[in-house]
């Protein structure tokens, strides 16, 4: 069973990384999106972001250098990604259960990072009672149960809301319930493992050390191995579901919500526009399904006042 857990971990992490990269690459290859024209745009310079303005309000803006700030953009993105700021401001009841779930998962990733650091320090020969290693182990021992507890409370709360709130229940598929159930089971096993067999994460550190050195040593706790299997399966499963939004949110914020680069001396934008304007229209609306117009470029340049539609019915 131990060998299986090690091999499954290697495979699961590889599947997660490859599937996540595949999803990101697929997104970046999508056709150019329509601009939302939503303000404020976080990276807007000149003090305009504070009141929802934009560079288009400047006279002859196309002749002026643009002022943008990645730091201002991150100052909006980071609180949203970590603390779900928009949900807090606009849907407080949902935030009450969604925040602990997401933040608990973030802390769980932090726990894994601490376990990796601790395993490396132990492999380097530091004794467990040394200052640095002891600090890392102590931090992991505190962070672990907090992370598991927060995520479990949030997952249970989200499941309850999907079952009882009509505004969510009407739009919930079986996948949503299965995903939450998978997290609940995995987190329950993690808490049980921590409480009964691995309160200081010594077994977990040994397992991580084995992974790093390819020393697939035996693990004596079946409960810990069950925890590993559930965690790895969940990790590998995430990129194939809507839960991938946790790592796709950066792209959705940057490329969809805030992308406002003007088409001025921008050959890459011209190339993208040329591609999408060459697509064949498939809409059936009369102002789109124009006889003889074979591309979106034809539709976009068609002037119904100068070129009456041939199929237009006359009174």
Say what each PLM segment does.
Residues 20-23, 27, 81, 159, ...:
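Generic, well-ordered alpha-helical scaffold segments in large soluble proteins
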Residues 24-79, 260, 264:
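Membrane-interface amphipathic/juxtamembrane segments adjacent to transmembrane helices
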Residues 4-21, 50, 55-57, 265, ...:
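Membrane-proximal intrinsically disordered regions of secretory-pathway and membrane-system proteins
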Residues 6-8, 22-23, 58-73, 137-164:
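Alpha-helical transmembrane segments and their immediate interhelical/interface regions
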Residues 1-39, 207-230:
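Long, highly hydrophobic alpha-helical transmembrane signal-anchor segments
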Residues 20, 70-74, 222, 243:
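Alpha-helical structural motif
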Residues 84-226, 231-262, 269-315:
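Long, contiguous internal "core" modules enriched in hydrophobic/ aromatic residues
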